[in-house]
């Protein structure tokens, strides 16, 4: 006889079941009841928006066994006028033996009982489809931008057959096949490097008088909050970039995972970029290429030179670590031209923004181009 399905919010009483689930999916092979309790309590204590309040985590049980889990991350969303408490929906896990049925639907449906204003940034088709089926709005894919650094190496390693399967024209894929020849690859690198230098020249002029710093710690709270106030004045929709958020997101428990490039106009902070080394070097999709990321980018709208200054600093950082390329995921239409002028190539995105605003009462923009969104949002800084 089939065992009953039960979806509900998880808490400390479920620590044993959560630990068993985490060991099974390989997220933490050493998970114990005690480690889960520490995780739940620490997550609540470190909540920068509602200290002491744990964000909802829900699960689906088959009988007494936890077979699916979905977590959330607290945030605040800006609508151009005010901030509202919200959650990122993140971490959609279903045990392999229980996929393909109603469990995913029940899992997300249960989560939506415990959150109001919410958003997610999934790449996989299934959670996107379930989200739309349950009333969330898919605003589309967030565009990727790639800055090639070691061009000859990229050309020689790129999989032209895979590109062909992903919609690259036959002529382009044939050209890329020939570009694998070393002499042609290095000649192409020289030509592309010269073209990028010419593209960047006007931006370099705009950046005169600005200074940049590369550090392992964020600037001070007052400077960060001042930059955030200026940034949001021209943005219609985004997640918060307050000092409290940035410290919680990129410093607390990050163990040096991120590097920070700050841009200054005299004593005033006019821009911040957050960079990250690749999490793994064995991803078969990357053909052995080492790709760093600019996971967040915050800019003073009164200083157009800040973006080029920060991207120069990010480029130097990436070259010092022998990265083959830099990836930046950015939704904001107004940054497309500056990014192209900085030598970034626009690519189709794989991460979608999905929003839930019950009754549309918060007035968030339905136009993805008007959002300020990066991979740093929703903890999506992975390839």
Model-assigned labels for residue ranges:
Residues 2, 117-198, 249-252, 259, ...:
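Active-site/acyl-donor-binding loops of N-acyltransferases
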């Amino acid at each position: 006889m089939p065992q009953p399905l039960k979806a509900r919010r998880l808490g400390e009483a479920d620590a044993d079941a959560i630990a068993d689930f985490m060991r099974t999916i390989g997220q933490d092979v050493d998970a114990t009841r005690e480690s889960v309790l520490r995780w739940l309590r620490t997550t609540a204590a470190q909540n920068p928006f509602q200290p002491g309040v744990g964000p909802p985590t829900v699960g689906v049980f088959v009988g007494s066994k936890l077979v699916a889990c979905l977590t959330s991350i607290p945030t605040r969303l800006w609508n151009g006028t005010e901030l509202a408490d919200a959650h990122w929906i993140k971490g959609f896990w279903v045990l392999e033996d229980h996929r393909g049925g109603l469990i995913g639907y029940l899992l997300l449906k249960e989560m939506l009982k415990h959150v109001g204003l919410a958003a997610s940034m999934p790449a996989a088709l299934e959670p996107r489809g379930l989200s739309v089926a349950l009333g969330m709005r898919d605003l589309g894919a967030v565009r990727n931008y790639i800055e090639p650094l070691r061009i000859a190496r990229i050309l020689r390693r790129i999989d032209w057959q895979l590109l062909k399967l992903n919609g690259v024209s036959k002529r382009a894929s044939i050209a890329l096949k020939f570009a694998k020849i070393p002499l042609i690859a290095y000649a192409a690198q020289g030509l592309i490097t010269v073209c990028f230098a010419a593209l960047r020249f006007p931006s370099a002029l705009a950046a005169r008088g600005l200074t940049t710093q590369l550090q392992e710690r964020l600037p001070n709270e007052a400077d960060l909050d001042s930059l955030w106030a200026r940034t949001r004045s021209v943005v219609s929709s985004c997640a918060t970039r307050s000092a409290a958020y940035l410290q919680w997101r990129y410093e607390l428990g990050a163990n040096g995972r991120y590097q920070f490039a700050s841009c200054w106009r005299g004593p005033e902070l006019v821009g911040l970029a957050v960079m990250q080394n690749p999490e793994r070097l064995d991803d078969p999709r990357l053909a052995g290429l080492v790709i760093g990321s600019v996971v967040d980018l915050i800019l003073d709208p009164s200083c157009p030179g800040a973006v080029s200054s920060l991207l120069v600093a990010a480029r130097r950082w990436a070259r010092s670590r022998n990265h083959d390329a830099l990836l930046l995921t950015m939704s904001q239409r107004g940054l497309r031209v500056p990014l192209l002028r900085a030598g970034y190539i626009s690519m189709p995105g794989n991460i979608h923004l999905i929003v839930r605003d019950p009754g549309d009462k918060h007035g968030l923009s339905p136009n993805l181009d008007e959002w300020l969104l990066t991979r740093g949002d929703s903890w999506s800084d992975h390839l």
